[in-house]
Amino acid sequence: IYFPPISTEILQEQLQKSGADPVQALVMARISGGNVRLSRELMQNSNDLMEKLYLLLNACFSSDPTIWNKCIDTIARLKTKDINQMEQLFRCVVLFFRDLLYYSAAKTDEEIIFKNQLNKIDKLSKIYSDADWHACIEHIENTQNYISRNGYLPLQMICMILDIQKSLKGEIYEPFQLRDWTPV
């Protein structure tokens, strides 16, 4: 038996009935992808999740190492506290970059998840018109994978930030492969 995902409108309505802010409820309903349990869990942690999301996004678009260190420290504490919340955070970052990819290609906000950040999405897509948003998403997903496999978190995060910043400039970047070290 297959149960399809619940519509965003129904989830948003349920979250609003439980006392959630309409804009925040819409964002959490869209992030959850039709999963009722996840939407409620995200709503309970929404302020904390959004604060950490903005910190991580700020690090991705900043060249200030103090912001990077604050982000790395936050992610490291989150990993030791609850790895599931860390993975939710990375999923949210991927969704934000997906919104940037979608908006820069389609120039419409119909399918944007982070509607509450539409001005920022518009501004970033104009500032980084040459950005390779898809490569940014790959960098984030790879970093999440490496950290989940016990990669050294500070190194992985710094590499991700630097790789994203190269992709934002539209620089062609080829990821390092292990075979690059082996003699031919």
Predicted features along the sequence, with ranges:
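Charged, glycine-rich active-site and insertion segments that engage polyanionic ligands
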Residues: 1-92, 106-184
